[in-house]
Amino acid sequence: MTRVKRGNVARKRRNKILELNRGYRGSHSTLFRTAQQRTLKALTTAYTDRRKKKRTYRRLWIRRINAAVRTKGTTYSKFIHTMKKDQIMLNRKVLSQLVILDPPSFSTLTK
């Protein structure tokens, strides 16, 4: 049986991991085993933080809307309740942008 040399495949796999770890400090960018662990951890935190970003932005939008609505003399929960009751279908992101970019049109919503 002929001999199968796998050097190219293994080297490509290792170099792919090491390429992802450029810019890391110490052995995390040069040694394969530590680089592999660091890559796994980095990819898992990137995955979780992509989901966490959605939560943090929603909280930011709610805080902006709440601050703007309280200047008009009502609370956030009452404002959202009246929006739903009047069937105004604007999401929190759009409302937050209205607060920042177009305050007069937002004040018409609070009336």
Swiss-Prot record:
Belongs to the bacterial ribosomal protein bL20 family. This is Large ribosomal subunit protein bL20c. It holds the Pfam family Ribosomal_L20. It comes from the Eukaryota. Keywords: Chloroplast, Plastid, Ribonucleoprotein, Ribosomal protein, RNA-binding, rRNA-binding. NCBIfam families: rplT_bact. CDD domains: Ribosomal_L20. Coiled coil: none annotated. One of its GO terms (cellular component) is chloroplast. InterPro entries: Ribosomal_bL20, Ribosomal_protein_bL20_C. GO terms for biological process: ribosomal large subunit assembly; translation. Binds directly to 23S ribosomal RNA and is necessary for the in vitro assembly process of the 50S ribosomal subunit. It is not involved in the protein synthesizing functions of that subunit. Its main location: plastid. GO terms for molecular function: rRNA binding; structural constituent of ribosome. It is found in: Plastid, Chloroplast. PANTHER family: 39S RIBOSOMAL PROTEIN L20 (PTHR10986).
